[in-house]
Amino acid sequence: MKLLTTGKVKDVYDDGDTLVFKFSNRISVFDKIIPNEIDNKGESLCRTSAFWFQLIESYGMKSHFIELIDNRTMRVRKFAVPNKVSLGSSNYVIPLEFITRYYVAGSLYDRIKEGKVKPMDIGLKHVPEYGEKLIDPIFEATTKREETDRLLTKKEAMEIGGLTLEDYCEIMEAVFKIDRRIDMEVSKRGLIHADGKKEIALDRERRIVVVDTFGTADEDRFWDEKEYDNGRVVELSKEMVRQYYRSIGYHDKLYYARENGLPEPDIPALSDDMVSKVSDLYRMMFEKITGQKW
């Protein structure tokens, strides 16, 4: 096998007609790789992703998943990853991330606080609090292959992704359909699915294929349902790590540098105690998301 890429989460190998994903214990936030490794993380992401791929295929949706090789390695179908695509392109990974939001959280909350998103833009007459449920879900697209993810308009997403309006709407419908399945599963085990990301390829007939990973404690935001009903948001995903870096002021320093064209500060390491907590979280979340034993 030939190593193709070493990413923030996994190493990708070319194995002839297929690709092999080897999931690492690396962890990143805000497009920065943290100088710690997290035990259990790679296995949690790999096994959780395999669970979802097998589930959506049982409902007739296509994915690139072929098999689990071991608990941290999976084999997937290969698609082209071109630098530029057009409406005539096929058999390629769309260079976008598709994001669905059901609650006010993450970067949406930041944009509201900064005045970049007005309450009326999301169907509200008041400034929402963190964790407030949206009246209607939000579907967004961001860049995938730029140094930092950039939020796009629908027109920009269609141009960058080589998509027609029909393609874009079909992808949106497919992503919401997947999320309904996620909701059905995780609600059985006391979780709220607050938001998530998906990556999509188009096959040779330009049919939708779900690729990369989804529904894990990395890509998606999960909350404890019982705590939420009692008025408290308890983060059960990588958001716990993002909140840690917000609490120590790193997030504000980083984004100030990005917005003003300054050198970006290095991300500090997590404390040993935090590393242990995050490791336990990934192991626990595999069980709560899938209903399977570790």
Swiss-Prot record:
GO terms for molecular function: ATP binding; phosphoribosylaminoimidazolesuccinocarboxamide synthase activity. The keyword ATP-binding applies. SUPFAM superfamilies: SAICAR synthase-like. The keyword Ribonucleoprotein does not apply. Coiled coil: none annotated. Its EC number is 6.3.2.6. Pathway: Purine metabolism; IMP biosynthesis via de novo pathway; 5-amino-1-(5-phospho-D-ribosyl)imidazole-4-carboxamide from 5-amino-1-(5-phospho-D-ribosyl)imidazole-4-carboxylate: step 1/2. GO terms for cellular component: cytoplasm. Pfam families: SAICAR_synt. It is an enzyme of class 6 (ligase). It catalyses: 5-amino-1-(5-phospho-D-ribosyl)imidazole-4-carboxylate + L-aspartate + ATP = (2S)-2-[5-amino-1-(5-phospho-beta-D-ribosyl)imidazole-4-carboxamido]succinate + ADP + phosphate + 2 H(+). One of its GO terms (biological process) is 'de novo' IMP biosynthetic process. Keywords: ATP-binding, Ligase, Nucleotide-binding, Purine biosynthesis. Belongs to the SAICAR synthetase family. This is Phosphoribosylaminoimidazole-succinocarboxamide synthase. It comes from Thermoplasma volcanium (strain ATCC 51530 / DSM 4299 / JCM 9571 / NBRC 15438 / GSS1). The lineage of its organism: Archaea, Methanobacteriati, Thermoplasmatota, Thermoplasmata, Thermoplasmatales.
